[in-house]
Amino acid sequence: MNNFFQGYNLLFQHSLFASYMDWFHAFNCSLLLGVLVFVTLLFGYLIFSTFYFKSKKIEYQFGELLCSIFPTIILLMQMVPSLSLLYYYGLMNLDSNLTVKVTGHQWYWSYEYSDIPGLEFDSYMKSLDQLNLGEPRLLEVDNRCVIPCDTNIRFCITSADVIHAWALNSLSVKLDAMSGILSTFSYSFPMVGVFYGQCSEICGANHSFMPIALEVTLLDNFKSWCFGTME
């Protein structure tokens, strides 16, 4: 049943935490469908028994017991995976191997690798005449944020002006960037690739032209990119 609901997602999830969240969403949808069927059958039984046994006095002790136990079981089935997800997310935030500071501006992003002195740059959307073959319109940038795969990365999100939101839907990442506040989260990316997102908070006239491009690569390629960028 979970596979049925997973087929109707908007995007495939490309991180471990996002995959767990995707499974938990499908699991809850399956539970809700089961509850809907159960309640429908229960109401049908009650309506039928009311007309069929209306001349008799009946106590619905079994029905009362069932209506007490069934919701408890449903809540327990939701609680166990929910607590597991919270525990897993807490473990991700305990330690990190690399820190990336992300600053939102009107209307571009700045990236600073705090553990690598001198590695910082701005990231602007590419115009139509700058796009290469195969690059997505309104999503590609001149400088991607490059990070190594299978490494716990701490992101520190803030803003230099108005409220922004650093969001990557296919990774289940969305964090508000607010001036004077440093929001942090840790994440690990097991899959190599380029993932695109956009600012998800209306921040002015060019809000729609503030894309995010995150490139996840192998550790050796990341080291080569760092040396090449700082030269």
Swiss-Prot record:
List of residues binding Cu cation A1: 164, 199, 203, 210
A GO biological-process term: ATP synthesis coupled electron transport
Broad class of where this protein is predominantly found: mitochondrion
GO molecular function: copper ion binding; cytochrome-c oxidase activity
Superkingdom field: Eukaryota
Alphabetical list of PROSITE patterns matching this protein: COX2, COX2_CUA, COX2_TM
Impact upon substituting residue 16 to M: In strain: PB826
Record carries keyword ATP-binding: no
Annotated Cu cation A2 binding sites: 199, 201, 203, 207
Mitochondrial intermembrane side stretches: 1-30, 86-231
Alphabetized UniProt keyword annotations: Copper, Electron transport, Magnesium, Membrane, Metal-binding, Mitochondrion, Mitochondrion inner membrane, Respiratory chain, Translocase, Transmembrane, Transmembrane helix, Transport
Cofactor binding, per record: Binds a dinuclear copper A center per subunit.
InterPro entries: CcO_II, CcO_II-like_C, CcO_II_C, Copper_CuA, Cupredoxin, Cyt_c_oxidase_su2_TM_dom, Cyt_c_oxidase_su2_TM_sf
Reactions catalysed, as given in the entry: 4 Fe(II)-[cytochrome c] + O2 + 8 H(+)(in) = 4 Fe(III)-[cytochrome c] + 2 H2O + 4 H(+)(out)
Role: Component of the cytochrome c oxidase, the last enzyme in the mitochondrial electron transport chain which drives oxidative phosphorylation. The respiratory chain contains 3 multisubunit complexes succinate dehydrogenase (complex II, CII), ubiquinol-cytochrome c oxidoreductase (cytochrome b-c1 complex, complex III, CIII) and cytochrome c oxidase (complex IV, CIV), that cooperate to transfer electrons derived from NADH and succinate to molecular oxygen, creating an electrochemical gradient over the inner membrane that drives transmembrane transport and the ATP synthase.
Subunit structure: Component of the cytochrome c oxidase (complex IV, CIV), a multisubunit enzyme composed of a catalytic core of 3 subunits and several supernumerary subunits. The complex exists as a monomer or a dimer and forms supercomplexes (SCs) in the inner mitochondrial membrane with ubiquinol-cytochrome c oxidoreductase (cytochrome b-c1 complex, complex III, CIII).
Family indicated by similarity: Belongs to the cytochrome c oxidase subunit 2 family.
Name of protein: Cytochrome c oxidase subunit 2
